[in-house]
């Protein structure tokens, strides 16, 4: 588990990810509602590290929320997943 101070330190390197209600949260704009390529890439990354985000899809927008529910806190797994998702997001 990471302290809030540690999480905020990591956030400085994570672009526009935010700490909201005990989760790391970020929304990504897509080119269209049917642009599922980004979500599929996120799913593959999540599966590869066995850590899965909450994914909310709205019209041309994908919101990702990360939290380690087994310990009810943000952990290094969330930071790793956010970092890898951020790399995908820069290619949108």
Indicate where each model-derived feature is located.
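Charge-rich alpha-helical segments
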Residues: 1-92
């Amino acid at each position: 588990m990471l302290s809030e101070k540690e999480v905020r330190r990591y956030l400085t390197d994570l672009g526009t990810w935010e700490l909201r209600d005990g989760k790391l949260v970020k929304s990504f704009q897509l080119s269209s509602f049917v642009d599922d390529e980004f979500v599929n890439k996120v799913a593959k990354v999540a599966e590869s590290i066995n850590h899965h985000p909450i994914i909310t899809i709205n019209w041309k927008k994908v919101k990702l929320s990360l939290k380690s529910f087994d310990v009810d806190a943000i952990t290094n797994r969330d930071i790793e997943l956010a970092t890898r998702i951020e790399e995908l997001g820069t290619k949108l």
